[in-house]
């Protein structure tokens, strides 16, 4: 009686594990025969917006430079 209970418990545990894992305990295919539904395209990662691009320093080069504080005259800001 005790042996039968242990076998039933092990069978129930095995069935619950295979149901939760979705049958992933089976060996996976090697990937030589890809199906159309399983093909995924790799996505290129996007770089930062204001990082160094074609010009070093990004958009900073095109901003108006602040005037030096050693000038004579009214303050521009």
Swiss-Prot record:
Signal found in the keyword field: yes
Tissues where the protein occurs: Expressed in the brain with highest levels in the frontal cortex, thalamus, hypothalamus and midbrain. Secreted by the mammary gland into the colostrum and the milk.
Primary location group: secreted
GO biological processes: angiogenesis; apelin receptor signaling pathway; coronary vasculature development; drinking behavior; gastrulation; immune response; lactation; negative regulation of blood pressure
Post-translational changes noted in the entry: Several active peptides may be produced by proteolytic processing of the peptide precursor.
Annotated site location: Important for the balance between G(i) and beta-arrestin pathways induced by apelin-13-APLNR system: 75, 77
Annotated keywords: Angiogenesis, Cleavage on pair of basic residues, Developmental protein, Gastrulation, Hormone, Host-virus interaction, Secreted, Signal
Comp. bias (Basic residues): 58-71
Region (Disordered): 43-77
GO molecular function, one term: apelin receptor binding
Pro-peptide positions on chain: 23-41
Gene Ontology CC: extracellular region; extracellular space; perinuclear region of cytoplasm
Localization of this protein: Secreted; Secreted, Extracellular space
Stored InterPro entries: Apelin
Hydrolase keyword on record: no
Secretion signal span: 1-22
Domain of life of the native organism: Eukaryota
Family: Belongs to the apelin family.
Function according to Swiss-Prot or TrEMBL: Peptide hormone that functions as endogenous ligand for the G-protein-coupled apelin receptor (APLNR/APJ), that plays a role in cadiovascular homeostasis. Functions as a balanced agonist activating both G(i) protein pathway and beta-arrestin pathway of APLNR. Downstream G proteins activation, apelin can inhibit cAMP production and activate key intracellular effectors such as ERKs. On the other hand, APLNR activation induces beta-arrestin recruitment to the membrane leading to desensitization and internalization of the receptor. (Microbial infection) Endogenous ligand for the apelin receptor (APLNR), an alternative coreceptor with CD4 for HIV-1 infection. Inhibits HIV-1 entry in cells coexpressing CD4 and APLNR. Apelin-36 has a greater inhibitory activity on HIV infection than other synthetic apelin derivatives.
Record's protein name: Apelin
Organism in which the protein naturally occurs: Homo sapiens
Source taxonomy: Eukaryota, Metazoa, Chordata, Craniata, Vertebrata
């Amino acid at each position: 009686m005790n042996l039968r209970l242990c076998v039933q418990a092990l069978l129930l545990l095995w069935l619950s594990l295979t149901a939760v894992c979705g049958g992933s305990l089976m060996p996976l295919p090697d990937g030589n025969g890809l199906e159309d539904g399983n093909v995924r395209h790799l996505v290129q990662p996007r770089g930062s917006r204001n990082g160094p691009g074609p010009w070093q320093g990004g958009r900073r080069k095109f901003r108006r430079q602040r005037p030096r504080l050693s000038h004579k005259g009214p303050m521009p800001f």
